[in-house]
Regions:
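Single conserved hydrophobic/aromatic residue that forms the stacking wall/gate
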Residues: 2-6
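A sensor for short, sequence-defined functional sites
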Residues: 7-191
Length: 191
């Protein structure tokens, strides 16, 4: 068992050079720890809704240097391969004759997305305000809301929503957007 610093540079400040290491290029670090079964975990103390191997996007560099005085180890790590962050959603819905969509959405947030979801929930005044924000954002009505692992120190959150949503209808036609819920609302590459 050991722990050590992994020194790196934020994504917005450039990469660490291979050929001429320089302390001036270092501007941040995360802690690496190895358990008895040789599994390495990485921790960042700067985020409030973090977990083992869940690092903020700005630290997901492809070149970070492990520096260990006790083991005399120095090696490169790709921190962008440490965690798997994703949102998996399964929607099962029925279109009713009146043009409404009634269904259930099961979502699993993992990694950074679980942290963002926790942060969003903590920012809401209470659970009613959180549900109202969800309804307003995607223009639907939540009939039942259930969630697991909200308070746990866990890299995943499971969410189950029973919902109804009104589709656009004219005299004889019902117009349905196949994207019942927005998968992206803002461009993440815009600053």
């Amino acid at each position: 068992d050991w722990s050590s610093d992994v020194c790196s540079s934020d994504l917005d400040r450039g990469v660490l050079p291979y050929t001429h290491p320089s302390i001036q290029k270092l501007n941040t670090f995360v802690v690496a720890a190895q358990e008895t079964d040789s599994t390495k975990v990485f921790l960042d103390g700067s985020i409030t809704c973090g977990y083992l191997n869940v690092l903020p996007p700005i630290l997901l560099v492809d070149r970070a240097r492990l520096v260990s005085a006790t083991n005399n180890q120095t090696k490169w790590f790709a921190l962008n391969r440490v965690c798997e962050s994703q949102v998996r959603a399964l929607i099962s819905a029925t279109i009713m004759p009146d043009g409404s969509i009634v269904g259930e959405r099961n979502t699993v947030y993992s990694g950074q997305f679980a942290g963002r979801h926790r942060k969003r929930m903590n920012a809401a005044k209470d659970s009613t305000a959180f549900i109202t924000d969800l309804e307003t954002e995607d223009d639907f009505k939540i009939l039942q809301y259930q969630q697991d692992s909200k308070e746990d120190f866990n890299s995943q959150i499971r969410e189950k929503i029973s919902f109804t949503k009104q589709a656009s209808a004219t005299d004889e036609y019902i117009y349905i957007n196949p994207m019942v819920f927005k998968h992206i609302s803002t461009n993440p590459y815009m600053q």
